[in-house]
Amino acid sequence: MSQEFAHLSVLLKETVDGLNIQPDGIYIDGTFGRGGHSRHVLSHLGPNGRLIAIDRDPQAIEAAKQFADDPRFQIVHGGFGQLADYVAELGLVGKIDGVLLDLGVSSPQLDDAERGFSFLRDGPLDMRMDNSQGQTAAQWIARAEIEDMAWVFKTYGEEKNSRHIARCIAADREKTPFLRTKDLADLIARITKNKERNKHPATRVFQAIRIYINSELEQIDQALEGAVNVLAPHGRMSIISFHSLEDRMVKRFMRRHSQGESVPHGLPITEAEINKSKKLKTLGKAMKPSEIEVEQNPRARSSVLRVAERLDY
């Protein structure tokens, strides 16, 4: 693997430590990427341990060949949103000792201009996590209504100028279709008046399109629900998020499953019944990378790790 596309796993020790790995346990790395977290998990497993990795990126599946000779490891080509389905097919529901999710786009995906994720590198406007299927960002931009684009930019990118940007994209695509990342990034930079300090004007729009194209938030929601339902009693989940939308989802999910389902005041429901709906115990506070890690890997700056443990059934 070239140095250009090398990937430094974020919060590596903290994330794997959060799983409290047992030598004979069964674990899931739902976001294999280039295998950094998987390698660390395998180093903690004994000969009877097992690691099931998942990724929908064909390049990640190719990278997984590095573990082809390790009988403890297997890779599944698919989205982590279907995690529970894969576990059910293997007959392992309720037997998983830990689930690891490193959300968002990986460094190799960002650094490879041909994947179309980066506004800093000119390449085809693609953005698909699985570039073997589904519509590209260019195809969506060519067809999307102004209102739909504005909604995506605001909802998934928290972009304040969403409507203005959507209108400008619609006007420009009538003359020339947006086929390259540079074309879209340059337009947004040109029409943005109040630029954020130390942030490219296209950051939020590119994030929004990527999340929408890949149904990322839906995948996260399905993965979290799936993980809590396949974990063994006292099994752990270590979840790394990189932006406020992701972290908000993870935080709310863990809070809901650790506090139990909320019920309207006055209903004749006992404390014991509420406790039955509690599935998780959150462990410690959210963790951020150290200053040293951020110096070594600036992309780790916004990462947040949350860990929870499955309660007894």
Swiss-Prot record:
InterPro entries: RsmH (IPR002903), SAM-dep_MeTrfase_MraW_recog (IPR023397), SAM-dependent_MTases_sf (IPR029063). One of its GO terms (biological process) is rRNA base methylation. It catalyses: cytidine(1402) in 16S rRNA + S-adenosyl-L-methionine = N(4)-methylcytidine(1402) in 16S rRNA + S-adenosyl-L-homocysteine + H(+). S-adenosyl-L-methionine binds at G35, G36, H37, D55, F80, D102, Q109. GO terms for molecular function: rRNA (cytosine-N4-)-methyltransferase activity. Specifically methylates the N4 position of cytidine in position 1402 (C1402) of 16S rRNA. Belongs to the methyltransferase superfamily. RsmH family. This is Ribosomal RNA small subunit methyltransferase H. It comes from Shewanella denitrificans (strain OS217 / ATCC BAA-1090 / DSM 15013).
